[in-house]
Amino acid sequence: FFKQKTAYEISTRDWSSDVCSSDLARCLVHRYPKAHASLLFVFSLCLGANSLPELLYAQHTPPEVVADQIRWVRIPSGKFMMGSPVPPSQLAMDFKEYEREGSYFQDEYPQHVVEITKPFFISPTEVTVGQFRLFVEETGYRTEAEVDGFGGWGFDPKEKKCVGRDPRFTWRDAGYLQTDLFPVVNVSWADCQAYCKWLSTKEKRIVRLPTEAEWEYCNRANIYLHYNVGNTSQSVLEGARTRKPTKESIRQAVQNLEIDPDDSTSFPQRVGLYAPNAFGLYDMHGNVWEWTNDWYDADYYKYSPLKDPQGPVQGYVKIRRGGGWNSFPLWARSSFRNWNTAESRCVNLGFRVVAELSSWEIEEYNKQQPIRLNFVGDIMLDNGPGNAIMNGIDPFANVASWLLDSDATIGNLECVLGREGEMILKPYNYLGAKNSDQFLKRYFTALSLANNHAYDFGPEGLMGTVNILKQNGIGSFGAGEDINSARHGLLLNVRGRKVALLGYNHFRMEDYEATETKPGCASLKTEWVIEDIKRVKKDWNAEIVIPFLHWGREMQDAPLDIQRIEAKQWIDAGATAVIGGHPHVVQTVDSYRGAPIIYSLGNFVFDYYPVDPLVWIGWGVRLTIPPSGPVEWE
């Protein structure tokens, strides 16, 4: 496995093809879709949070960069957690040598879910001097530093530090050795816009600066540490062009730091000298800061939209990201937010560009890609998990990156969210904590309600739960206002492919069964499942059909013989996979005609049976479903 090509070994010819992130560690390129990323996940756990496999950041040959062509990297759509993975107080502790209060980091918080809904192209490197020169030669463009005559910033060897604004310094000369392969600097935000407009004409597509969300999504490539190269300052000092702080220098402004003119490591480098991240992008930390398209607002994360945030509609300063060659590691972190006035031109500030795909390209791209569906087991947000939510703690936080790293995530909700109704008489009743919906909507596309706890507060509680989920954009299935709605199922459009989810309950099903006049669950009857599979394939033209069952015996590690028989019958009827839960433990798995049968996922978020170690193990299952061929799963 480790001998296969990793992302940093992609040839320039590969850059124009899909450089997709693999599961969890996201380290392999698109050409190796069957690589077992779970191995890297285990490997990363063994290494601990402070390091990543050295393989990813080994020596490599810098990429070929030419002035007359951007070799785009295609970035897939997806969800990620934006912002600092730890709260401001912890950041202050992690970087205590900088003597910063927690409030200094407040604009990186709260960490929140962002969905990038469309794939896009991004330049693998920062725009180079040579690439910018071609733009100037073809258009006669003059930068703001040249037009206003004030110049930019640059290195003065006599003073041994950077000075500015100074007419001596523009994008053509920053005072240090600078070839056509170096990142262009001393360009204002307006200069970047002019370059994008010119390149849009040449590329025959919209070219622009990345949004702040797109930039962090690309930087992280699903790595939720301080840096995409590790979690310590040393990791970014070794994996990017940044400056090592000292007790003396850490208290000085960057522009006042003395620089040795004979030390080439004190300045920017040619692009791509360090290994890329898992998306195949170079210098996302250090080298030069990078302009983004967004205005800055310190409180923006508090009201930022979930999908494709564009930043505030107006502001006074523009956001820049990533840190520069003279930045200390604190400011090169993946989540660090910095800003400049739009007319700024700096010796450590450049840019990279994004190109939008047409609607036709997105449609064709989606047709060629597999879709990935995550399934998890029992979710109960009362008791311990409920207390956590009441205290503002996210019970899903430790697996957030895995939950988000899919096209859709589905679970089994074993509690009531609605406040209507009365508690029915039974041994265990679960009422999800207030605000549970705010955490569920971060991660879940759909939830099955076909279980014995959906009815804990009677029909009013059940329908209240259905309505709350609907209000939060979460689909539900397996229960409803009558038997028709309970059996109806849920149709998802997952990147242009139709996925039908069907839910059924077997445990004491007579007590919770929906009828023609009463809300409840869809009971697990083999003939109903077969009928419903055939119905959704015919009426909805569903390509993918997955029954999600609440069945089996509790605390048993193997299914009943009848379950094995029924699962095969449903696959014969057209089911793509069969997924189950309820026993509170994981069970044997089967495969039939290439379709996986997961009899029980066990608990996911649940503190029932706290003294029994068997229930401490739960599975998350990912189905990878290509346009044609068998389903892959892990």
State where each predicted segment sits.
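Single conserved hydrophobic/aromatic residue that forms the stacking wall/gate
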Residues: 1-23
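Intrinsic-disorder-associated, low-complexity terminal segments enriched in Asp/Asn/His/Tyr and depleted
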Residues: 30-32
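Short, compositionally biased
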Residues: 41-43, 52-164, 168-169, 189-190, ...
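Functional-site microenvironments in short loops/helix caps that host divalent-cation chemistry
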Residues: 74, 81, 85-104, 142, ...
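Active-site beta-strand termini and strand-to-loop segments that position acidic
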Residues: 284, 355, 492-495
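Acidic, metal/ion-coordinating pockets
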Residues: 362-634
